[in-house]
Amino acid sequence: MRKWDERVPNTFGFAQSLFDFYNKPLDEELWQAQMDAIREMASHESCVIVGRNSEYILREFDHCLRVFAHAGFQWRVNRMAGKMPGVSLEQVASDVRQADKARKKSCEHYTKTRYRDAANYDLCLNTEKLGIDCAVKFVLEAAENL
C-alpha cells in the first residue's frame, strides 16, 4: 500500500482507454477506498488523520479541525535524518524532496487545489519556529474549542 501512497494515476492516453473502459485504474480505486475509509472513521469517532488529502476529503464535516504543520526544508531533512540512522543526509534530502513532489502532485490531481495553500486549513503552524510540543498544545486547544 505504501508504494501507492500519494501517487497520481499513470495515464497512457488512448491505449489505456481501450483496456480500462470498464475498469478504474488501481490508483483511482485506492483513492476512492481511502476517501471512504477517512469519511467513515471521521463520522463515527474523534480521530487524527495525517496527510492523505484529508483536509479536502473532510471539507464538508462541520466538527473537523484541518491543521497544516509546516517547516523549512532543511529543518525537515535534519529531523528525518535523526529518525533514519545510517542514511546519508543527501539521501534523506532526496527522499524529502521526492515526498514533497509526490504530495504536491497527489493534491493537485485528486483535489484540484494548491498544495500547502493556507486557505484549505483552519490552523497553520510552523513547527520549525514553535517546536513540536508547542504545536501540539495549539492543536489541542483549538480542538477543545470547536
Where are these regions (language model features)?
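Short gly/ser/thr-rich secondary-structure transition/capping motifs
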Residues: 28-32, 47-51, 105-109
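Short, amphipathic alpha-helical "lid/cap" segments that border enzyme active or binding sites
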Residues: 35, 132-140
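RNA pseudouridine synthases
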Residues: 41-44, 53-61, 70
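Conserved nucleotide-binding/hydrolysis micro-motifs of P-loop NTPases
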Residues: 54-56, 71-76, 130-131
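Conserved phosphate-donor/acceptor-positioning beta-strand/loop module used by diverse small-molecule
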Residues: 60-83, 89-99
